Amino acid sequence: MNNPTNESLRNVAIVGPYGSGKTTLLESVLWVSGSVSRKGNIKDGNTVSDSSPEAKARQMSVEVSVAGIDYENLRLNFLDCPGSIEFAQETYGALVGAGTAVIVCEADVSRVLTLAPLFKFLDDWAIPHLVFINKMDRAKQPFGEVLQALKSVSSRPLIPQQYPIYKGEELQGYIDLITEQAYQYHTGSAADPIALPAELAGAEHQARQEMLEALADFDDRLLEELLEEVEPPQAEIEADFKQELGADLIVPVVLGAAEQDFGVRPLLDVLIKEAPDPSVTAARRSLSTDGSGPVIAQVLKTYFTPQGRLSLARIWQGTLREADSLNGQRLGGIYRLFGNQQTPVQTATVGEIVGLARLENINTGTTLSTADVKPLPFVEPLPPVYGLAIAPEQRKDEVKLSTALGKLVEEDPSLTWEQNTETQEVILWGQGEIHLKVALERLERQYKLPMVSQQPQVPYKETIRKGTEVHGRYKHQTGGHGAFGDVYLTIKPLERGNGFSFSETIVGGVVPKQYIPGVEMGVREYLAKGPLGYPVVDIAVTLTDGSYHNVDSSEQAFKQAARLAMTEGMPQCNPVLLEPILSVNVTTPTEFTSRVLQLVSGHRGQILGYEARSDWKSWDQVAAHLPQAEMQNFIIELRSLTLGVGNFTWQSDHLQEVPDKFAPNLRPD
């Protein structure tokens, strides 16, 4: 389709937890729509969307991939999104540009909670969505139980359009609740219409009535028809689904088994008939889709390909032409995408999702336009929860590491990096262990930078518990001018958080003013590595007395004298190790809160309190102080306890004495 119109476009994000079958569903969509000659398989590594070595090696999606197809006189752009929570940034960015999301889930009550963060994001951003219950041929529980569980994680009413037909435990087909037509599945081909099984007539009637009553909550005319026992026409029911889905008021539910292509054609029919076209989502942003006004687009994802930078963008307003300039830059090309295939086109109409080539210094989330316009909203980068200290295998590569890391962060905004000024390490931050492993593999594959990694060092400090007075004298004679410095210092502890203070109470010029900076310099140099091997904080040092020699004294000599005094005096001050304490806020489903409290306590944490989330039913927030030393694998353990959905944010808070039983093991090498 050369120039699709609003009415003939659908932008559909396929989302869901890891292992729910999203990529398999997309492969089935491509197969039954005639878009591929052979259906790919994740195990064989030949799917359209998972083409990167990192995805193939793990048999999981690690970045969003686009597959645009023409089907039934429509242009459908499918965005296959990662399911792992560690790659949620990819999913959220893609959803901002989608018109509809298909939530793929398993027919397994125990896995329903993994959908909760996804439902909340869709609700918060008012993105229309429907549910495809996958793997119905291997359902763990009856359809009704799965549906009830799904309702517990959605703030919108879930309304099934289909009802499954089983023979024993074998999935045979489904009943379309709108038309009341039953169908029998066939692997690899379309389902055939069959007579409605007599034993399901009662269940079908009840399910259909519940569907109509749910729709009637949003349609007074339909409500009147039901009250008067008038059978609503099929077109009216379909129109209600289309209108309420487009307004993000309901969540239609369909079912199938993508591995066998069951339910895929009906899903496509639902997307064609009910999914909103681009004008609906654009209207929410007060944008015009009639072709008037300047071009407005937004970058949903940034790729660095062998051919250069490629920006995945949604055209929100206007028609983009190959000769246009966006944000002052001339386009390097417009491409329609099908996995890693790029097809050049001369124009992209409003609503399309396309690749834009070689737009330099344009980041993910950037609003692009041919005019000066207000930036469109975009999802914020996820805060980091897991870090590694990294370095190139070869020191000669250190120079190009920062450039490569910059590009890595542009591709994935949920990655960040820093040069830690205290430990001198380069720290790469992300969303989990797999997330960072993939990032390191990309550094090696894309930028020829083999890396080594380890847990980041904890920036311990030390302080003192009591004060002392100490004398330091430096005297050195070499023939000719010697060196002489003589100081008396008072060392005292300060309140936590007061850092370092230096003062002097010299009377009568016993230490000339020009030498006092040398004393302070000597003290500061010593405090960079105290008696326990770490920087010293919360300490006050006062120069109280001393003496000098007219010929042999110098600033350098007084610096040495001060160092000698500190070296002698500090061990007398009962030095103690301090560790950084983080302020941590953990988000967890209420049913796991007690486990989370135990986890925090088991990591030497101090629980400050917990409460129900006001913006998220059946979820709690736990506030705590935790030692940084206990946080390296905290996210891994938290997710293990909470079906992968627990999360936390953190920030540095204060320093605290290390318990005596841990301190002896923390001396640096």
UniProtKB/Swiss-Prot annotation:
Please give the Pfam families that the UniProt record associates with this protein.
EF-G_D2, EFG_C, EFG_III, EFG_IV, GTP_EFTU
Q: Where is this region: G5?
A: 257-259
Region G2: what ranges? 59-63
Annotated segments matching region G4: 134-137
Ligand binding (GTP): 16-23, 80-84, 134-137
Q: Which residues form the tr-type G domain?
A: 7-279
UniProt GO BP: ribosome disassembly
List keywords of the entry alphabetically. GTP-binding, Nucleotide-binding
Looking up InterPro entries in the UniProt record yields: EF-G-like_DII, EFG_II, EFG_III, EFG_III/V, EFG_IV, EFG_V, EFG_V-like, P-loop_NTPase
UniProt region (G3), positions on chain: 80-83
Please list the GO terms describing molecular function. Answer: GTP binding; GTPase activity; translation elongation factor activity
Superkingdom: Bacteria
Keyword Transferase among record annotations: no
Task: List, alphabetically, the Gene3D superfamilies matched.
Answer: 3.30.230.10, 3.30.70.240, Elongation Factor G (Translational Gtpase), domain 3, P-loop containing nucleotide triphosphate hydrolases, Translation factors
Similarity comment text for this entry: Belongs to the TRAFAC class translation factor GTPase superfamily. Classic translation factor GTPase family. EF-G/EF-2 subfamily.
What PANTHER family does UniProt report for this protein, alphabetically? Answer: ELONGATION FACTOR G-LIKE PROTEIN, TRANSLATION ELONGATION FACTOR G-RELATED
Could you tell me what this protein is called? Answer: Elongation factor G-like protein
